[in-house]
Amino acid sequence: MRHRHGYRKLGRTSAHRKALLKNLAIALIEYGKIEIGVFKAKELQSYIEKLITAARSGDLNAHRYVFAYLQNKSATKKLITEIAPKYASRNGGYTRIQRTRLRRGDASQMAIIELV
């Protein structure tokens, strides 16, 4: 049973899931919004909101924490210098998920996740 389990496995091993969330987070930071499956979007929302909350302080520890998760210099810099300051007075709720369509190939529910 999966009672009170904290995250979705997304049908992947732990390393694959970690790499997937890292790459989706980098894409969201770079483009501002992306269209993916609903369950991936919900997992990404949790992942990215923790990073934005950590990046809001903007100090060296924040840089190191965010870089440890993203491992991408340009995404880390953009998150800390451009994105996080916009949410300085906001306590959570930095992203929005909107369900869009059913994917043609497998009728999977798609969603757009975007930075508010």
Swiss-Prot record:
One Pfam family cited in the UniProt record for this chain: Ribosomal_L17
Keywords: Ribonucleoprotein, Ribosomal protein
Record carries keyword Plastid: no
Keyword field contains Ribosomal protein: yes
GO CC terms of this entry: cytosolic large ribosomal subunit
GO molecular function per UniProt: structural constituent of ribosome
GO BP annotations, alphabetical order: translation
UniProt xrefs under InterPro entries: Ribosomal_bL17 (IPR000456), Ribosomal_bL17_sf (IPR036373)
Self-association and partners: Part of the 50S ribosomal subunit. Contacts protein L32.
UniProt family annotation: Belongs to the bacterial ribosomal protein bL17 family.
Name of this chain's protein: Large ribosomal subunit protein bL17
